[in-house]
Amino acid sequence: MKTYILTSPKNIPYFNAALEEWLLTEFKKGEEIKVIYFWQNANTIVVGRNQNTYAEVNLSEVEKDKVNLFRRFSGGGAVFHDMGNICFSIILPKAKKEMENAYEETTRNVVKFLNSVGVPAQFHGRNDLEIEGKKFSGLAEYLSKDRVLVHGTLLFDTDFTKLAKYLNVDKTKMVSKGIESVQKRVVNVKEYLPNLSTPTFLEKMVQFFTETEHAETIHLDESSIKMVEKRAQEHFQSWDWNFGKTADYNFKNKKRFEGAGIFECNVQVDQGKVVDIKFYGDFLSVIDITPVTQQLVGQKYDYQTFAKILGNIDNFKEYFGTLTPQQMLEVIFDNKKDE
């Protein structure tokens, strides 16, 4: 299988997201290839696909400081990017999705590179890379028709004061971890490589992957760049994508499940039937969850109806990661089994 590598020519989040999507869905379409993609976003908040932007982000501070904000197309939680942060994507044929420990296997060479330069990095938990118990990288996954994408951040020299300033960390997550602040849960790789600048570190990382994977560098032509820029402006930079429709709901509930993440449900009910329903959270979905919520709209708002629908979803794990239908029902109905 041939491997390709690319470092984005821009640090604009909307462009970089559109370029990532293009690599996933259009580049060498129909061919079984591996793509390694590096990019950096300047001064940017990134929320997960299934998160509520208004709840996750301190919007007053974001607007005051003119911080970029966009929603990625994968699940997981919100993060802050600056030029001390390096993002990476690894794209593989969809068949590779079936391997066990997909996150760990896919990012094995990231850990190998860091170990080779003296950083004691390791994979931990459901989707994190850590150094001595502190997180420096969070991973998320997404499936296209033919390919699987695993991508993540790598905190090299990020300003953690901004990380805490712009993100509203969920209290249930903080309580479960027994830690007081965002800063105490994360670490910069630069603490272990004090003599390296971010550009030099990225250069070494790209060189390592190019040599280890025998990767061919991708050279973007003008038509591809224009296509990516058009997609960035029309989709990833749009209000509809980044904020979406909001509404008043009859019922809202949220809970964190160990090993699965936060699940929040907002339901609007009229005359006993679901008019609208939204699921939010940092659960690790790899495909769009809209088909699930569409099945629930118009149904009776009762436990047995929802249990039957959720229980009959064959690819449930692709929609909700390690969340179970029972856990979702617990949140949706607050432990009340309506008859």
Swiss-Prot record:
* One Pfam family this sequence matches: LplA-B_cat
Occurrences of domain BPL/LPL catalytic (ranges)? 30-217
- State the UniProt keywords alphabetically: ATP-binding, Cytoplasm, Ligase, Nucleotide-binding
CDD domains linked: LplA
Record-listed (R)-lipoate binding positions = 135
Q: Does the keyword Nucleotide-binding apply?
A: yes
- For this protein, what is the EC number? 6.3.1.20
- Where is ATP bound in this sequence? 72, 77-80, 135
Q: Name one GO cellular component term.
A: cytoplasm
Q: Per UniProt, what is one GO molecular function of this protein?
A: lipoyltransferase activity
What compartments host this protein?
Cytoplasm
What processes does the entry annotate via GO biological process terms? protein modification process
Q: Identify the pathway.
A: Protein modification; protein lipoylation via exogenous pathway; protein N(6)-(lipoyl)lysine from lipoate: step 1/2; Protein modification; protein lipoylation via exogenous pathway; protein N(6)-(lipoyl)lysine from lipoate: step 2/2
PROSITE patterns named in the record: BPL_LPL_CATALYTIC
Q: Which reaction does it catalyse?
A: L-lysyl-[lipoyl-carrier protein] + (R)-lipoate + ATP = N(6)-[(R)-lipoyl]-L-lysyl-[lipoyl-carrier protein] + AMP + diphosphate + H(+)
Q: What does this chain do? A: Catalyzes both the ATP-dependent activation of exogenously supplied lipoate to lipoyl-AMP and the transfer of the activated lipoyl onto the lipoyl domains of lipoate-dependent enzymes.
Q: Belongs to which family?
A: Belongs to the LplA family.
**Additional info?**
In the transfer reaction, the free carboxyl group of lipoic acid is attached via an amide linkage to the epsilon-amino group of a specific lysine residue of lipoyl domains of lipoate-dependent enzymes.
Cross-referenced NCBIfam families: lipoyltrans
Name-wise, this protein is Probable lipoate-protein ligase A
User: What is the originating organism of this protein?
Assistant: Mycoplasma pneumoniae (strain ATCC 29342 / M129 / Subtype 1)
